[in-house]
Amino acid sequence: MTVFSKKMTATIPAMLLCALLSGATTMSYADTTNPNAPVSLIEQWDKTFPESAKVDHRKVTFQNRYGITLVGDLYLPKDRGERKLAAIAVSGPFGAVKEQSSGLYAQTLAEQGFVTLAFDPSYTGESGGYPRNVASPDINTEDFSAAVDFLGLQKEVDRNRIGLLGICGWGGMALNDAAMDTRVKAVATSVMYDMSRAMGHGVGDGKDRYTTADRRAVLQYLNAQRWKDAANGTFAPGGHDIYVDDKGNVSAAARILPETLPANPNPVLKEFFDYYRMPRGFHARSVNSTGAWNATMPLSFMNMPLLSYASEVTIPTLIVTGEQAHSRYFAEDAFKAIGSKEKALVIVPGANHVDLYDNAAGKIPFATFAQFFKTNLK
């Protein structure tokens, strides 16, 4: 249902008449009076990691520039006193929720003296936005700036000492925002993806996977799905890692991860499955754990490169990745493109991509992240 202002109601009959006379039909995807409102605000602790006794936790909401209400977890060190502290906005991985990796990073850094905010991106988790399970290079970059807005208004925060930390696909978003938002004073990524490159060119073995013909085939596949969605008045779910075989045939899985792991799985699939689908990292609100994105979601990423202005990231930058991470090439290429003279690339020995999600293997270099932000948010 669409809600119109009083001013608009006078024009509705004329609009409907025009539609009838022209033989026009309308598409209606939503039936909600406030699609930008939070989906939920769960107060009890429902994270995939234990609550720290050293940190105060608050459930918070804030709006981005598009009017979507985001839901976050604010973490504050218990021993903060009355002084204003540096703050860090944290999000990711791509398709995860704040109760997973980003919350763990945020809480751990709060133990080190920072005010931190882990938040659900627009259209996912508890945050508002319709249709559900959509990502956008523009709106999700804005989500980081909205988090900066929120942090800068908190009485515990020194607004001149705010940084960003993006995990997995949110690493690219963090770098994109750091190039745009001059209020951000330091930026870090962990096992970053450039999602525009991943979806626009395919994730290969240390390099892009799609040929020019493959890209065209993927675009045709996605736009054919648009016709189906338009005809059905709904948004079909579908995987965002789209495959093109040697004959140009295009396919995508119905889910991000299978319900059960197949025999002899791809090692990267097993990494993700062992986190998102198992008790270790499963969360009911995580699209990676339970389902799929909107099938046409990759369209905006195909032609909107996130790191076009990486050379304009001139603030201190920390890029962390795993020695064995399949995503390592994203981090190394981003590091080369970053314009800052104060940048560091840290490759964690023996770590794969998901090792840096939850520290089950003890490989997340939290001390490195903490020292980076202490040095550059002072």
Residue ranges and their predicted role:
Residues V134-K155:
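Alpha/beta-hydrolase active-site loop
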Residues T108-G128:
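Conserved alpha/beta-hydrolase
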Residues R83-P93:
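Short beta-strand element of the alpha/beta-hydrolase
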Residues V313, I319-T321:
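Short beta-strand/loop motif that positions the catalytic acidic residue
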Residues A37-R83:
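N-terminal cap/lid segment of alpha/beta-hydrolase-fold proteins
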Residues P349-A351, N359-K378:
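Catalytic active-site module of serine/aspartate enzymes centered on a nucleophile-bearing elbow/loop
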Residues G95-Q107, P121, A331:
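The serine-hydrolase catalytic nucleophile loop
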Residues N176-F272:
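Alpha/beta-hydrolase-fold enzymes
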